[in-house]
Design a protein with these regions (language model features):
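Composition- and surface-driven signal marking solvent-exposed, interaction-prone regions
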Residues: 3-4, 206-209, 222-228
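Exposed loop/turn and edge beta-strand positions of beta-sandwich/beta-sheet ligand-binding modules
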Residues: 44, 111, 138
């Protein structure tokens, strides 16, 4: 069957309309770029509570760090200049600088505390990103689109918690066993904790909470019946 120029343009326009409609459905909902599959875990406002009383040894914290990083193909780079991290530990004075004082118990001073992205209500990282590579979903999760990231690092400068990492080198050789359910990144891209939005869409629990033996709890901040 032959197709003249006018017929081709009509067909192309129809295909574009169908594709545009499909994309619009996929992106439907304020602040959402993810489809909601059957069985997905949902919340009005996702939140996390970390009970540090449950983390009594270095192994307790390392377990959740390893589980998170393995699930999301976070590279393990020994050079601290190129380190990439989604969840990590630091001392009390670095985690809670406003609550540090001269009479703080020594045990508290020396104890490691877990850190990760705070999923801010009004995230400065999303406001300074020129390509909309980082954005806030309607449920409060601050997500990241690696393909849109141009590596300007404005989001890193805007984040007051140091929760973002930049891939100074190709991260793929530093990923041990690749998880095929989550994309690997490339050099020149920023990344951070995404509150396991990919797992929630599959109906799976946030990975760090899953392996924390009750030390990390996630739930809906707007639901009075939620664990948080």
């Amino acid at each position: 069957m032959s197709l003249d120029r006018r017929g081709f343009l009509k067909l192309a326009g129809f295909i574009g309309l169908v594709a545009g409609t499909a994309c619009a459905r996929r992106l439907a909902g304020p602040g959402s770029r993810y489809t909601t599959a059957d069985g997905a875990l949902e919340a009005k406002r996702w939140a996390m509570v970390i009970d540090m009383r449950r983390f009594t040894t270095a192994g307790d914290t390392q377990r959740v760090i390893d589980a998170c990083h393995k699930a999301h193909n976070v590279p393990r780079i020994d050079d601290v200049r190129h380190e990439v991290k989604w969840i990590w530990t630091d001392t009390f004075d670095h985690v809670f600088p406003d609550q540090t004082h001269a009479h703080l118990p020594k045990a508290l001073q020396e104890r490691p505390f877990l850190l990760l992205c705070n999923q801010c209500d009004n995230p400065p990282c999303t406001r300074v990103c020129p390509t909309d590579a980082t954005y806030r979903l309607a449920d409060g999760i601050v997500a990241q689109d690696y393909h849109r990231c141009i590596g300007c690092r404005f989001c890193m400068a805007g984040c007051p918690y140091g929760a973002r990492s930049f891939n100074w080198v190709n991260p793929r050789p530093y990923v041990g066993e690749v998880n095929p359910e989550f994309p690997t990144r490339s050099i020149g891209v920023v990344e951070k904790c995404n509150f396991c939005v990919d797992r929630l869409e599959r109906g799976e629990v946030v990975r760090c909470a899953e392996v924390s033996a009750g030390g990390i709890v996630v739930g809906d901040l707007n639901d009075p019946e939620s664990e948080v």
